[in-house]
From Swiss-Prot:
The lineage of its organism: Eukaryota, Viridiplantae, Streptophyta, Embryophyta, Tracheophyta. Its cofactor is Fe(2+). It comes from the Eukaryota. Keywords: Iron, Metal-binding, Oxidoreductase. It comes from Arabidopsis thaliana. This is 1-aminocyclopropane-1-carboxylate oxidase homolog 4.
Length: 351
């Protein structure tokens, strides 16, 4: 009966097409049962604070020893702040404002983009795993495939279309540079990862976390790793992102002008665990202001792609044999779409 009730609640929420923002605008003072996190999730939110020496690494793209530092961060943390990346602050600010502007619109302006078809060029939704998860998360999402074939401007939301296209081009250039540095950190030719098409595809995720009346009972986005080679995240100043490191949840406190880079599952697989995919989450927003973030994942996401990937042969040896079987990104996406967000994916490909 309980699962049936949850299913009907999820169906009603989905069919309303108003998202979490619509719930907040309706004046609710308690979160619906659909969004109440599991006891295990709530217990993890009360875990002890990390030791002070555990701080998120920062990589200066124009600094000395950048290859060594980016390699160390990718190996030990799977996530780092990136400064001096070359993208103007004005562009970053317009990107955040654009995504926030979309989500802050009246429901009718957003409904034409609402969909559960994750192969669409552009879609607005709340919780991709709404029907599979034990509890929904307190966020709404605008998703868009931005490479290799960017959408037409007229197909994008008017409030943010131009900056979406401009920003995605900036991130493509930055991503290519990051893949060069990561290739060198692996001891490979600087073009190795790019030649593997790691930078070929992009998917933009514009997340909106409205203020929550009961932030201690739900979560912004549950713990997960990204199904990507690399994710470039732009966050506003509200905060809430946390990364799991050495058995602690550590705040990824916003740094003005910086981007957050995290290694995805695909990169962990092809580097044979040399680089690690960072498990992260976002706690529910208890402030009076909405939290907005923009992630660009270097991935085909839910679109079919037949290229086969496996551990890079140049990284393997008798002492370091392949830990994963070959697979396509489509196989990975199929598992992702059939599971809850927090379900591990990499172990399905372990040898």
């Amino acid at each position: 009966m309980e699962s049936t009730d949850r299913s009907s609640q999820a169906k009603a929420f989905d069919e309303a097409k108003i998202g979490v923002k619509g719930l907040v605008d309706s004046g609710i003072t308690e979160i619906p049962a659909l969004f109440r996190a599991t006891p295990a999730t709530l217990a993890s939110l009360k875990s002890p604070p990390p030791p002070k020496h555990l701080t998120i690494p920062t990589v200066d793209l124009k600094g000395a020893s950048v290859v060594e530092k980016i390699g160390e961060a990718a190996e030990k943390w799977g996530l780092f702040h990136l400064v001096n990346h070359g993208i103007p602050v004005e562009v970053l600010e317009r990107m955040i404002q654009g995504i926030r502007g979309f989500h802050e619109q009246e429901p009718e302006a957003k409904k034409r983009f609402y969909s559960r078809d994750h192969t669409r060029d552009v879609l607005y939704f709340s919780n991709h795993d709404l029907q599979n998860s034990e509890a929904a998360s307190w966020r709404d999402t605008l998703g868009c495939y931005t490479a290799p074939e960017p959408p037409r401007l007229e197909d994008l939301p008017a409030v943010c279309g131009e900056i979406m296209l401009e920003y995605s081009k900036e991130i493509m250039s930055l991503g290519e540079r990051l893949f060069e540095l990561l290739s060198e950190a692996l001891g490979l030719n600087s073009h190795h990862l790019k030649d593997m098409d790691c930078a070929k595809s992009q998917y933009m995720v514009g997340q909106h976390y409205p203020p929550c009346p009961q932030p201690d009972l739900t979560i912004g986005i549950n713990k997960h790793t990204d199904i990507s080679f690399l994710t470039v995240l732009l966050q506003d100043n509200v905060g809430g992102l946390q990364v799991f490191h050495e058995q602690y949840w550590i705040d990824v406190t916003p740094v003005p002008g910086a981007l957050v880079i995290n290694i995805g599952d695909f990169l962990q697989l092809i580097t044979n665990d040399k680089f690690i995919s960072a498990e992260h989450r976002v706690i529910a927003n208890g402030s009076s202001e909405p939290r907005t973030s923009v992630a660009i994942v270097f991935s085909t996401f839910m679109r079919a792609y037949s290229r086969v990937y496996g551990p890079i042969k140049d990284l393997l040896s008798a002492e370091n044999p392949a830990k994963y079987r070959d697979c396509t990104l489509t196989e990975f996406s199929t598992i992702f779409s059939s599971k809850t967000l927090d379900a591990p994916k990499l172990h399905h490909f372990k040898i």
